[in-house]
Structure formats: C-alpha cells, structure tokens
Amino acid sequence: PKDKAMTLLERVIRNHRCRSTHHFIAFDALSLISGDEGEAWKSLFLVHHEHLLKGAKAPDAEFKDFKNHVLHVSEGEWGGARGKAQEWYARGVELLSKKRWSEAAYAFGVLSHYYADPIQPFHTGQTEAEGVIHRAVEWSIAKSRAETDARIETSGYPEIDVPDGMGFVSDMVREGAERSHAHYDTFIDHYDFDAGVANPPAGLDETMQAAIADLVAYATAGFAAILSRGIEEAAVAPPKVNLTLQGYFETLDIPLRWITAKLEDAADKRTVERMYAEFQKTGKVIKTLPADDKKIRALHAKEVRRIPLKQLDAEEIAPIGTLNENRLAAEPLELTQQAEDIVDDIPPAELAEISRRDSTKSGIRGLFGTRKRSAPEPEEAEVAADAEEASSAEILFDAEEEPAETVQPAKAPKVEEDGSPRRLASITRDDPVVDAPSIGRKTAK
C-alpha cells in the first residue's frame, strides 16, 4: 500500500461515522486500494460509505450468525468464517460487475466483518477464562483507538500476499486466524480486568497494545487486498463522482449520532460491569454473558468438547492477567449497587437452566488465583436491555454530470441469514471512539 494522507472530507466522515473497530477497518482500507484507479474507487466507496459501514456491522446487528464469526484453528477449524467470507466476496464482485454500486459496497462491508473477526484472537478458540474477559477486552480495544492509530501511523501497514486460486478469500481468513491465534493465551495472561472495567484502556499493557495494533493493521491491509482483487475481477470502470465537503455537511445528523453513541457507551459499560460483578462474586461469568457469547459457548460445548453445560459451568478457570506489565497494588474497583445486584437479577427464561446446575458449591479459581464460590442463588427478574444501534440510510453526494452512469446510493439489500451474532468490537464508553486522531497511510518497510 502507498503512503496516503487523508483528505479533510475523509477525516470528517471517519470521525463522524466510524464507531467500532469493524467500521475503522472497512473505512481505512479504502485508502489502501491498489491499482491505477484506486483513488477513483475510493471516491466511489466514500459516496456509498453508509452502505459499506452498515454491511460491516450487519453480521452482528442483523444476521446474528454466531458460528460464522469464528475460526478455531486448533480445533479442526470449527466455525464458518471461511465459507461466509468467500460467499460475500462472490456476491460483491457480481454486484460490482453489474454496477450496482451501493449494494456492492454493502456486500464488501459484510465481507470485511467475516474476514476480520477471526483476526481477533478470542474468535480463534474458546475457554472459560476467555469468556470472563472477552467483552471487556473488546471494549478496551475500541476505547484505545487513538493509541492504535498512532502505532499504525508509526509502523505502517503490512504488505499482504494474496494467494492464487478460486478460494483465496477463504485461505486469507485462515491465515489471519492463524496469525491472531498466536496471541490467544497472551490476551488472557496480560489483560487487567480490574483496571479495564474502571478505565478500558488501562486494562491493556504494552504487550497487548503492540499485538492489537499489529492485528488491526493486518486486518485493514488484508481487506484492502481482497477489495482490490474484487475490483480487478469485476472488470468495470468506476464512475466519476463529485465529493464535496458541503454536500456531506448537508447530511449531518450530529445530535442523533451523538445520542446513539452515548447510549451504546452506557450499554457497553453496564454489560462489562455486570460481568465483572459476577466474576468477583462467583469466580466465573455465566449468567451475565452477552447473548452471542452464550450461544458460542453452548455450541462449542456441544459440538467440540461434547460435554453438558452443567459440567462446563463447574470447571475452574485459568488465572487471568497474571503477566500484565502495568499491575500496581491498587484497590479493586468499587462497583455501584446496581452492578452488584445484577448477579442475582436473572431473566425467568434462564432460571430453568440454572436450576438444573449442581447445587454443590465448589472452590473455583478466580482472578489471579483467589478462591471463590461457584454461584449465588438466583432470583427472578429482568435484565435491562442494551440500547439498540440506531441507523439511517442517507443519500450523501451527487454524481458528476459528466459520466453517462449516475451514482445514486440505494438502500442496502436485505439479506436473509440464519444464526446469531459474534463480535470484534462495536464498543464505546464516555467519549466516542470517533475522537481518535486521523492518521496518514504508511507502509511498513
């Protein structure tokens, strides 16, 4: 990839629209599109960035196909990420060849999600220790975007070799999963849950920050390489478009976006605090696991380990964060009463399953080797629902009058998919991730 600085328009769009790691990967890849017409293709996708970014979150927000978000490289490649990425690549190329620009942008956005998810180490394996901190780690990653940007600006993006053959996208998903899986145990050993629940970036030490920047840069460059190959395969020329800052400003909905980001921040904070409270009280996280994590945990227990959930619930977990380089003798976070109460605040639908668990309390190894009892007695209640992501389709820029073909963003296609979601990181907290500084494009030497 070439060294490219973002234009003012690109920086405005990036800061206004991107709210998750998936968004940043898909958007930043546009500046790395190769070929003589790379800039023209970037401009086209900028016109349709709403569809690209909507697609980048669709597997989490719409499809909810949990198993397709993972690839367990040490467990017979359990998971469906390879097939889904290949499927959406083919769909994106077909739409490009038909000049259905907005639909193609959506399809490639979806592809970016299935490609990037296995480049998050916790999407390449499954352990009880990981389950405790999975959501917290992703929250910390999202809230550390400024640090990640700065590191990538310094080190640059890697050169990606695109394999030969019809299944090259599938092969690239596997290569990314293998690269990230090397950090699986590292993330468990180095994440400071105590620090991260109070201040998300503080949960990451130097080892984790370096690994995160490397993986995010790799995922971004990898998706750009796939997108470049898809453009080449579609064998069509990009239409000319007129990108103006004024045209973009006319579409701004800053108050709505700001409110949505704040709601998402509050929901993510509440989720992580509840998980932390359960861990402090029981030594595990079972009842407060997000729905996607629960589904993957249950499927993995059934299809890979072939054990009942009751047996899995009783297992001890490995110590967490024992190698964190920033650990200080600090007092644990004092949680609010609301967070403490949530451990006993279980939806009625889950009580039947919980009641079947072994009532015998056994010693379980908690954070850094402390011993904790296995579970509290549940009471029937409803857990507050997380805020749903608000989305709106917008027509942003006018096409130039020169070309015969006009560019008019259309609604992203509705695609029916089975399953439920898995996540890389659509998480924010008190200040939106969009405050991350813009960066130029640099290539690792």
What residues fall within each predicted segment?
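Short active-site segment of divalent metal-dependent hydrolases/proteases
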Residues: A116-Q120
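Generic structural signal for well-ordered, non-transmembrane alpha-helical segments
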Residues: V110, A217, A221-A224
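Intrinsically disordered, compositionally biased tail regions
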Residues: T336, D341-K372, P376-E379, A387-K445
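Homeobox/homeodomain signature
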Residues: A104, D386-A387
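Divalent metal-coordination and catalytic microenvironments
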Residues: H113
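N-terminal, motif-rich segments that launch catalysis or mediate targeting to/interaction with membranes
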Residues: K2-K99, E103-Y106, T124-L204, Q209-A217, ...
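N-terminal, non-catalytic alpha-helical interaction modules of very large eukaryotic scaffold proteins
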Residues: A235-K240
